Design a protein with these regions (language model features):
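Short acidic-hydrophobic catalytic motif
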Residues: 1-33, 43, 49-59, 67-91, ...
């Protein structure tokens, strides 16, 4: 698709990922989940994951495919798509979003929240693959609306605290750009 014709929006549900060219704009809504965006500036190829947990916690069974619900497998699946397009992981730029605490005041003292674990896992995975992280918006309280313009490599993030007005997030969802 020619980007001059306009971009096509795709919305990721939890456990989904997408890799596409400049003709796409990828959106998602995150709470404690985390999204990793990858962008290759020269080819304007980009991808986004929306994972729920850092890893499966047990080995995959023989013949079992990669599962986008898990950060390690979601990143591996995205990197395989990039490699099929001739892009090596270290040629990409990464940004990380999400990991919010959705239930402040309901945590045990000293216990790491799932959002915190997800964000730390994303950082570690990208470091392991040698992919530079050029931006992040992690942790805090509440959810985030994320919009990734693959053509430009720009990612917009709007964080809304629990119980707050969601006006800014609603505007982003309707296509009102910052």
């Amino acid at each position: 698709m020619d980007a001059s014709e306009g971009q096509v929006d795709i919305f990721l549900q939890p456990g989904e990922l997408f890799v596409g060219d400049a003709g796409w704009r990828i959106r998602t809504l995150l709470g404690s989940c985390v999204s990793i965006t990858l962008w290759h500036p020269a080819s304007r190829l980009g991808g986004m994951s929306h994972f729920l947990l850092p890893s499966r916690g047990s080995p995959r069974l023989l013949g079992q495919g990669l599962d986008g619900r898990y950060g390690d497998e979601a990143l591996q699946a995205m990197l395989e798509d990039f490699e099929r397009a001739g892009v090596r992981p270290v040629q990409c730029q990464a940004k990380i979003f999400g990991g919010g605490n959705m239930f402040p005041g309901q945590s045990r003292a000293g216990a790491m929240q799932v959002g915190q674990r997800n964000g730390e896992a994303a950082r570690a995975l990208l470091c392991e693959y040698g992919i530079p992280v050029v931006g992040e918006s992690l942790f805090g309280f509440g959810h985030r609306q994320i919009i990734f313009d693959v053509d430009a490599g720009d990612v917009w993030s709007c964080q809304v605290a629990p119980g707050s007005s969601d006006t800014a997030s609603d505007e982003l969802a309707q296509g009102v750009w910052p």
